[in-house]
Each structure stands twice: as C-alpha cells, then as structure tokens.
Amino acid sequence: MKKLIFMLLLSSGLIGCSAIDYSELSSPVSPSDTQIERIISLGLSHSDSLLEANKLMDPDLVAIVVKELENRKVKADEAQIEEGIVAEYAEKIIILENNSKFIGPEINVRRKVGLMLESDYEDYYLKGQKDLGNGSISHQLYLSLKYNADKLRNYNSANFCDKWQDCSSGKKIVVANIQSGAGSCSGSNCEYREIFELEFTDEVLKSYMNDGLSFVITSKRNSNKITIPANYIKGYLRVSN
C-alpha cells in the first residue's frame, strides 16, 4: 500500500514538472531592445530613426539605442556594397552550351616576392560544367602563374587553408598541370609560365561562399597562396547553380 501511494505521488510530481511553462524562464527583453525594435518598425530613414531615439527620456538608454542603430546602418551599408560586387561578378559569367557550361571573369593579381622586387603574376578564373542528365555540377579553377626565375619551379601540389589562414595541414586539392614553359630570357633568368586546373566539387565550393577560398600551391622551393574572394564565389555560384 505504501509503495502504491509513493508511486502515485511520484507520478503526480512528474506531471507537475512537465506542465511548467518554460517560456516564463527565458531572458527578459531589455528596454533598449524594445525601443530598437519599436523604432525600426516605424520604417523611418536612418536620420529620422536617430531623432526618434533621442526623444527617449533616459540618456543612457538613448546612447545604447543610438549606438545599435548606427551599427545596424553600417552593416546594412556593407551588405549593400557586397551585393553590388556579387551582382557585378554574376553579370560577367559567360554561359555556353545550353546553360551547361559557365566561365567566370578572370582575376589578375601581381604579388611582390623576395628582396629584388620581383613579381609573380597570378591569373585565375572559375569554370563549371553541368551534367544536364542529373543536374550535378563540377568546378575547376584555371590558374596561371607567371614568374622570372633561373629554372622552372614545377609546382606539383596544393592544399586548402583553414578559416584562420593556416595552410600547413589543410586537405589536398587535385592539381593538373596542363601547360608549362619558358618565354623571353635575360641573363640566367627566364620568364616562366605554369598553367593548372584545380578540381572542386559543388559542395566544397559552396562551403567557401561566406569566407572565401584560400589555398597554397607549392613546388620544391616555392609556394604561392591564392585567395578567391567570397563575393567572386557567390557571383559565380549565383549563375552556375
């Protein structure tokens, strides 16, 4: 009998616990958040929103609300600029073969190397091929490296950098050297060019849309860090996907 009573009391206690309204335990909305959302809901211009914030009676509350409104304005402006750059890249995508082939605009980078003020020239663009049968897309990065040296560098491997730009232990990238050779020479140095294609899956490329994609391509004695901006990737994928 005692055991039965104990079980009844225990079950009623559990039922009581399950009936607790946990929404009441959530963090209360601060006065500043309330005022910020109220002002934003008015649909005012930024300057008028600041005027509305300055009507508040508490000077400390005014300072907090104004600061947050300014921060949101900066973020909105940055997002607008970013969208403009993305749209510009997207407009430059070349579409071929019944919407199955995509070629992005070429990016040209001049990079100073060494103490002799020599320069490496890095030219690259993304291109993609869509399988019209199953809709899958494969992507390649066309990369041209031009430099002056006493011999060909023979780049042969590449690996990703992480979001902290550490490239020492990143995953390997499939690299195909499709062309290399020397141009004009002066003394012991010649102008060399090596051209590569690097393979990226659609999933991998999409994972770098927010932070951009950086990788290091290396030879026995040299390494070059290549960075594809996030807005370039977004513009390219906006069209290719």
Regions found by a protein language model. Give the residues of each.
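A generic "folded-domain core" signal
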Residues: S18-E203, S207-N210, I217-N241
